[in-house]
């Protein structure tokens, strides 16, 4: 599973949807980045392949960051993303 995580302004919790295939995850990531650059469409509706009925609609102007990562079955103490620690 591949996760696409959106960080929203003034929200402590990210929004996450998942894709089964890496190509589909990369395509969704690119679509979100293009939407942020262009501001079109104004609203972005995302669905999740892991949770069938999960739908998220977000105002594109409120997205501050997007990241893609592979979700592994093993649990680790390190969260995906960027770290300022060495």
From Swiss-Prot:
InterPro entries: UPF0367
NCBIfam families: PRK13683.1
Family: Belongs to the UPF0367 family.
Protein name per UniProt: UPF0367 protein NATL1_01981
Annotated source species: Prochlorococcus marinus (strain NATL1A)
Lineage: Bacteria, Bacillati, Cyanobacteriota, Cyanophyceae, Synechococcales
């Amino acid at each position: 599973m591949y996760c696409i995580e959106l960080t929203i302004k003034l929200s402590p919790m990210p929004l996450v949807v998942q894709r089964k295939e890496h190509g589909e995850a990369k395509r969704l990531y690119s679509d979100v980045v293009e939407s942020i650059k262009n501001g079109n469409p104004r609203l972005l509706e995302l669905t999740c392949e892991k949770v069938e009925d999960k739908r998220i609609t977000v105002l594109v102007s409120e997205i501050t960051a997007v990241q893609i990562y592979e979700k592994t079955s093993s649990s680790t103490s390190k969260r995906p993303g960027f770290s300022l620690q060495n």
